[in-house]
Amino acid sequence: MTFSSNPLVDETFMAPAHHLLAHYVRNRRKQNTGLSDERFLTWGVMRALDADESGRAFLQARADQAESLPRSTWFDAFKSKRRLEMLTEVATKSYQYFDRELGDRDWLAEFEELNDHPVWAVDGHQIAHATHSERDGKGRYVASGMIYGLCLHRGLMRPLARFQGDAKRRHEWPVFKENWQRWLQGEPRQLMPIIVADPAYVNNLYWVLEKIHRHAMIITREKENMEPMIYGPCGFDPDDPINRGVVSDDHAGYSNAALRRIHYRDPATGKDLVFITTCNHLRPGLIALLYFLRWKIEKAYDVFKNRLGVTKAWGTGDTAALMQAHFVALLHNLLTVLLARLEHTGLSETKVIDRQKKRRDKLPPDKQVPAQNNVRYAFALTCQFIRTVRNALRYKIPWEDAYPLFKLRMESYL
């Protein structure tokens, strides 16, 4: 990033998405008036960033800044299948583009055995229904639910599919099964994907067959009502620091399939956890680490809700829901890329890194987990960083003035 020409922050923040839209998207429609695709893309990201309580409030804020748009034009855009196709294409290509740009910012760089495996934490996320949403047969509103994936290499987010909303209720699992293989098409890494999910995604025979067909491997938790038969140990090196906390690593049989079963006792808390997986080539401590990193998707949802204020559906129907999910994920990824670019200029989230180090140093050596200490960059976007970006874009601040603000807010808490 260079500041010699002193551009505005908003000119550089949206530049990657606009570049992809202009040069790599087939569903783009060129128009110079009204709500162009470029304007729709920018406004959708800003709608997610500005934390306005409603779509009308967002449009008023735009109008008060001399950027007015008819209300019907904005809301009708969220019913457009063509615009959804355009946005989906931008989001998909942006993930691939950002993955390359963040090449040296890999959460899992210390673990060479994961270099060529896509590793995705997957979970559902619910927000309040839209104002005009339908009620179900019992007269109740249904929250809008979307499945997302978080890349555990780069921290990038991608929506997968909607599983409920507008009077319809579905469990995450069948929706995930219907969509995940299409969702992972074009994944840049060469080896089999690893999916890390909570016990809602337990289906032992399904995952064994997926591995046999070389589609994907699973890491999840054993359910309390599962009664395995232990066949024998897999064997692991207890002296490997990565395996600290591993009690046992066994082959286990369940009602309809055999999996690897890892009993882990968290050194910091003493809590016992049991993981099941079809990954047979990874060290057991690394299996435990990847499951612990699954919680980072929960942290991302907390950012969506409490730091970005995205708590309610913007419209009704699957088209509007998917557009909103793409805009929120694209914003998350643009913020992640901006943070990485700032790091290349010498800035970093010093306050977060120092706090993590202090928390770790308080633990006695026998309660520390070396595997967790080897994970870099895996922290949530902070309130101060998000506010600084929001203010820089809202008030059209040039980089010459914004850079010292980023330095101040990233180095220490208010």
Predicted regions and their residues:
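Short, charged amphipathic recognition helices of the HTH superfamily
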Residues: L49-D64
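Short amphipathic alpha-helical "interface-anchor" segments enriched in bulky aromatics
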Residues: I287-G315
